[in-house]
């Protein structure tokens, strides 16, 4: 075939395949069989193979996958991907509705519209289009940063590689614009069942959401393509759509080629909202995919900024979640787990029962006070409950069903793993194993924490591998990870040479993690990532922190007496100091890096407090803006405070600031100071 003929045929095949994709995924009106579609696709692939210079990123052939991604790079979202506040109570939905009406200005009218949508039980992602072409797909991650999984996103048939309009029209319609589309990736029930059926010798996925989450993080995009997933769009950011109502944006998404689910409705009263929720509580069972609730949004985006957002969620939307599913079963036994800090947690062993699409055999009992409160015994018939992806919990004993041979759950006197006598600190609920350095369960849990995403982020280091490393005496603490060799690791179960090298590369990369993450990774009791940041800001090296007196630590912003005591005790423990020295030898960052270049110096040296609610920024975002300009957010107000930024509904700090003579500004003036 001549090149000009190939070009013409390739263009025809692409247009046809894109049209069939749209009819199948968006309109649910397929015109041809899967076999006929595959035949057309194979012809396109063959032509592109013969003329490789004609391959384009938006070609349907690029959905087949085949790219191997060794590591997903991290990307920063243009706007934070906040989750919605959620409730299981219709009363709280009504309170939300009334609260929004009260906060809206008069021009919103007496009965502003809300949009009710189905809440898909999937994995949130963000898609970025430039000039009409898909250039990036990213996971939500922590809301600020996510993983770039573009090769895997490209394999999803309901994700347009090019926004509808054709190549010629794309430049005209979308040229010079960046468009962001957010939504959920999910798996249909029949596709999920087929996936599990094709894994007879492998562990079965618990539910479609777990299967979707796991599939999106696979490194082989060809395998991702084989697992059928869908994308439902629910949010559009487009410079040309700013004046559109939310429901109009959903319709615009459909015009662009996206699947939106279609089951959304505008509501002008709470009665209409309640009817929608009630109708779908029943009708959702007929769908071919899982939904776990209803999302309610104010229809007019012009008022979204007016209502603002908390640090976690917008005030103009809420998610109503259908009540948690429950099931009855028998509590056969109780086992005791040991956490990284030695906490003993009772876990119920249950007679297997189906709940929320999964088979449940275990459930948490939290602690021994909870066991007493429930008055639960071994042999009892109990009710368990599961909300979303939360671990199932025992919520009550079924009245009148207790057997004569039921037995009380005894508090163990010794650690179930290492046999050390347990301790029960005064004024604490939990019991602890004090054998922190030699108890295998604690050692393994600490290493897993050290390797976790927010700590050292050592990919490939999972529970089974840590189990082997500890059991075989290769590691006794987190510092030993940096002494592992390829020969040692490759001899472990399911660890070929390639897997061993991948692990060692991940460990090597972790040496560059920031000082604050190393502090968090140490696993100091009561020290989360936010506290680790405060400590790193106050003490620029671990040596300064280790030598700090208890009184000094107590004066650090947001570090109370309990945390101060915990940090102080940690650095007076010889085993902890030995671990720090191992990490120093391994080359980890035990001191703060040189500060990043400032955007400007408008807040240089200033201690700033925020009170009330800011409309344009979350509290964390505002604090970051101040830090980028040389200032620092503080929590405690005193005469040494330089500035108080007062948002809506400020607290008592405003009055205190006025009494102390501290400068107070509003959000508008704060915005002006940024530039």
From Swiss-Prot:
PROSITE patterns: BRCT, DNA_LIGASE_N1. Signal peptide: none annotated. Keywords: DNA damage, DNA repair, DNA replication, Ligase, Magnesium, Manganese, Metal-binding, NAD, Zinc. It catalyses: NAD(+) + (deoxyribonucleotide)n-3'-hydroxyl + 5'-phospho-(deoxyribonucleotide)m = (deoxyribonucleotide)n+m + AMP + beta-nicotinamide D-nucleotide. NAD(+) binds at residues 34-38, 83-84, 117, 140, 184, 297, 321. One of its GO terms (cellular component) is cytosol. SUPFAM superfamilies: BRCT domain, DNA ligase/mRNA capping enzyme, catalytic domain, Nucleic acid-binding proteins, RuvA domain 2-like. Its EC number is 6.5.1.2. CDD domains: BRCT_DNA_ligase_like, LIGANc. Its cofactor is Mg(2+); Mn(2+). Belongs to the NAD-dependent DNA ligase family. LigA subfamily. This is DNA ligase. It comes from Prosthecochloris aestuarii (strain DSM 271 / SK 413). The gene is ligA.
């Amino acid at each position: 075939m001549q090149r000009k003929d190939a070009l013409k045929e390739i263009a025809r095949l692409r247009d046809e395949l894109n049209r069939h994709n749209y009819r199948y995924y968006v309109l649910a009106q397929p015109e041809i069989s899967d076999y006929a579609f595959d035949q057309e696709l194979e012809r396109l692939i063959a032509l592109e193979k013969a003329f490789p210079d004609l391959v384009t990123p938006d070609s349907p052939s690029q959905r087949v996958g085949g790219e191997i991604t060794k590591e997903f790079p991290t990307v920063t979202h243009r706007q934070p991907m906040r989750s919605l506040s959620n409730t299981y109570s219709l009363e709280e939905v009504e309170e939300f509705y009334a609260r929004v009406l009260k906060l809206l200005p008069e021009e919103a009218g007496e009965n502003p519209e809300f949009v009710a949508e189905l809440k898909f039980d999937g994995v949130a992602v963000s898609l970025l289009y430039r000039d009409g072409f898909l250039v990036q797909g990213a996971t939500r991650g922590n809301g600020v940063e996510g993983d770039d999984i573009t090769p895997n996103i490209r394999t999803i048939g309901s994700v347009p590689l090019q926004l509808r309009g054709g190549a010629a029209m794309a430049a005209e319609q979308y040229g010079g614009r960046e468009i962001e589309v957010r939504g959920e990736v999910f798996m249909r029930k029949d596709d999920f069942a087929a996936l599990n059926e094709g894994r007879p010798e492998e562990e079965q996925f618990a539910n479609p959401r777990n299967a979707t989450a796991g599939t999106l993080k696979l490194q082989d995009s060809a395998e991702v393509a084989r697992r059928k997933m869908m994308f439902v769009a629910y949010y559009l950011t487009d410079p040309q759509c700013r004046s559109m109502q939310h429901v109009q944006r959903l319709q615009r998404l459909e015009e662009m080629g996206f699947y939106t689910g279609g089951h959304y409705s505008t509501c002008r009263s709470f009665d209409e909202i309640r009817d929608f929720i009630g109708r779908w509580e029943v009708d959702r069972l007929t769908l071919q995919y899982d939904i776990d609730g209803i999302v309610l949004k104010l229809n007019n985006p012009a008022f979204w900024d007016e209502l603002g957002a908390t640090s976690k969620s917008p005030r103009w939307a809420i998610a109503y979640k259908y009540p948690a599913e429950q099931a009855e079963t028998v509590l056969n036994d109780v086992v005791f787990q040991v956490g990284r800090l030695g906490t003993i947690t009772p876990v119920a062993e249950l007679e297997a029962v189906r709940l929320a699409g999964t088979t449940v055999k275990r459930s948490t009992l939290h602690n021994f006070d909870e066991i007493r409160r429930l008055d639960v015994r071994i042999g009892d018939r109990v009710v368990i409950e599961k909300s979303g992806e939360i671990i199932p919990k025992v919520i009550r004993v079924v009245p009148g069903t207790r057997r004569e041979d039921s037995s009380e759950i005894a508090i163990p006197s010794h650690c179930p793993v290492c046999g050390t006598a347990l301790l029960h600190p005064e004024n604490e609920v939990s019991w602890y194993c004090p054998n922190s350095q030699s108890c295998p369960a604690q050692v393994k849990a600490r290493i897993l924490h050290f390797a976790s995403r927010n700590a050292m982020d050592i990919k490939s280091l999972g529970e089974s591998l840590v189990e082997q490393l500890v059991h075989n005496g290769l590691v006794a603490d987190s510092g030993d990870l940096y002494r592992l060799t390829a020969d040692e690791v490759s001899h472990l179960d399911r660890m070929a040479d390639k897997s061993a090298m991948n692990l060692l590369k991940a460990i090597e990369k972790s040496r560059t993690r920031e000082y604050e993450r190393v502090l968090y990774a140490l696993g100091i009791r009561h020290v989360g990532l936010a506290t680790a940041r405060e400590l790193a800001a106050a003490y620029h090296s671990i040596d300064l922190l280790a030598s700090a007196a208890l009184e000094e630590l107590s004066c650090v912003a947001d570090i109370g007496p309990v945390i101060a005591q915990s940090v102080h005790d940690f650095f007076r423990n010889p085993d902890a100091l030995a671990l720090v020295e191992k990490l120093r030898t391994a080359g980890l960052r035990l001191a703060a890096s040189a500060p990043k270049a400032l955007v400007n110096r408008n807040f240089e040296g200033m201690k700033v407090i925020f009170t009330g609610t800011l409309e344009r920024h979350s509290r964390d975002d505002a604090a970051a803006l101040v830090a980028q300009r040389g200032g620092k957010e503080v929590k405690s107000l005193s005469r040494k405070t330089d500035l108080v930024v007062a948002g809506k509904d400020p607290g008592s700090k405003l009055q205190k600031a006025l009494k102390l003579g501290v400068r107070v500004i509003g959000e508008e003036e704060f915005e002006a100071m940024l530039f």
